[in-house]
Amino acid sequence: MKTLKKLLFIIMAVAVLAMPVFGVQAAESDIPVTEQSGVSPTPSPVPIRELVTRGNKIYYYYKGKMVKNKWKRYNGYKYYFGANGNAVRGGQRINNVIYVFDEKGRLFENKQNKIVKSGSNIYHIRTEHGRASIGYFIYKNNLYYADPKGRLYQKKSRQNGQLYFTNSGAARKDYNALLKMRVMQIVSSITNSGMSQSQKLYACWKYVVYGGFYYGGPDPNIYKSGWARSEALRMFRTGYGNC
């Protein structure tokens, strides 16, 4: 029983250490965005505001000058123009936050908790302001993983092949994925964003030691690959397990 409890704590500790850390960001209202009209107030040889497409690149000009490293809203859509003046696409890190833009450079707004596609990649939007999920997350009772640029894993494995992510981005629902989701749910329920990493680990340790887990159930086949993780899943689900 002690061996299984150690395994449960190790699994929860790994989940805590793997949790993405989101630094304190400026409020969405703090992002400098200038509302711009798509129509020049008066005819002019040089338009005051102009969105220009050259090949597959999109630029924004204000009084004839190319805008760089700025957010701009044009005809109701929000764009970010990078260091080269080109509107960014896909998942982009801006002020240490990953935002997602479509193939026309428009920010995915009002798409909170939805999966979207941009180019050949898919992303999960976690806020109404276009911020992407990073790392492991649960969506519609399925496990997903997003890389540091917010791109969902598709037809790829993680954790030495224990987790396989299908073409939809959802992990194959075997005991490995189910265990990962159960641990994430438990850790989320016993910790909070204000806790330090050591406080979270201590909370997990207390949960395993004092959480009311008992020895019981049929003997597992210890010669079968993955038996320990399968028993850990049963323990987390029912409170009983056989070490």
Q: What is each model feature region?
A:
Residues 2-181:
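Extracellular adhesion/carbohydrate-binding repeat motifs centered on closely spaced tryptophans
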Residues 178-235:
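Secondary-structure boundary elements
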Residues 238:
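Acidic, glycine-rich loop-and-strand cores that form catalytic or ligand-binding grooves
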Residues 242-243:
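Mid-length scaffold segments of soluble, non-membrane domains
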Residues 1-2, 196:
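General helical secondary-structure elements
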